[in-house]
Regions:
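Glycine-rich phosphate-binding loops of nucleotide-dependent enzymes
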Residues: 1-150
Length: 150
């Protein structure tokens, strides 16, 4: 059922008044396979997976539907380096496919490597904004500390 979360009310997961469990299982199986979720068992609930594998599954579920806008909030928190690299590659592939991506992260390295444009918010206001190629590291770090913010 986790594979259909947020989309359970429409096809292909819903048929009339009922959920199509076969389609949900097939989708979950594809996510588990494509995103390297371990253990590769469809009978486990979300609690049966480690935090990192739960995160892999969520990333897979959200990317599986080819969204026009992807809001990724701490997409690699709690995952190992291999999973982080894999999720980063998937996010970049989505960007290359034309998906608009809003990435929220406390990991500045992640933000710099994945973002075309960087916005730093401080107390709800934009404290710094720049294209990746135009980042002024001194101003960026001041903004991160709340120095010189509006």
């Amino acid at each position: 059922a986790n594979a259909a979360l947020g989309r359970h009310d429409r096809p292909p997961f819903r048929r009339g008044w009922r959920l199509d469990r076969r389609v949900m299982a097939e989708t979950a199986g594809r996510i588990i396979e494509d995103f390297g979720v371990s253990p590769r068992r469809l009978d486990l609930t979300a609690r049966g997976f480690s935090g990192g594998n739960q995160q892999r599954f969520v990333a897979g579920r959200e990317l599986a539907c080819a969204p026009p806008l992807l809001i990724a909030v701490h997409p690699t928190r709690g995952v190992d380096l291999l999973a982080t690299r894999f999720i980063h590659e998937r996010i970049l592939a989505e960007r290359d496919r034309g998906t608009a991506i809003l990435l929220v992260s406390a990991d500045l390295t992640e933000l710099r490597s994945l973002s075309d444009r960087l916005l730093i918010l401080y107390r709800g206001r934009v404290a710094y904004e720049a294209a990746r190629s135009e980042i002024d590291h001194a101003r960026l770090h001041r903004a991160l500390l709340g120095l010189g913010a509006p």
